[in-house]
Amino acid sequence: MMNGLVVKRGTEFLARKQCRSAYADEDGFNWSEELQAARVYQNHETACRAARRVGGTVRLMKDGRVVE
């Protein structure tokens, strides 16, 4: 079963998960510790994996920035 999809689009990578996750709270998206760490360390692979896990969407720019 595939949990997520990573698509390259021009200068960014889009990581998303089709189903909602337990990490999403009633106020909207809630960053997990793993995704927060990915934002700090700007690690594309970690951010993609974390985005799929928490059911959110992140853009991973070529210059290394991880943005919501």
PLM feature spans:
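Detector for methionine-enriched segments
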Residues: 1-2, 61
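Short aromatic-glycine-(Arg/Gly/Cys) micro-motifs in beta-strand/loop hairpins
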Residues: 2-37, 66
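Short, mixed-charge low-complexity intrinsically disordered segments
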Residues: 36-68
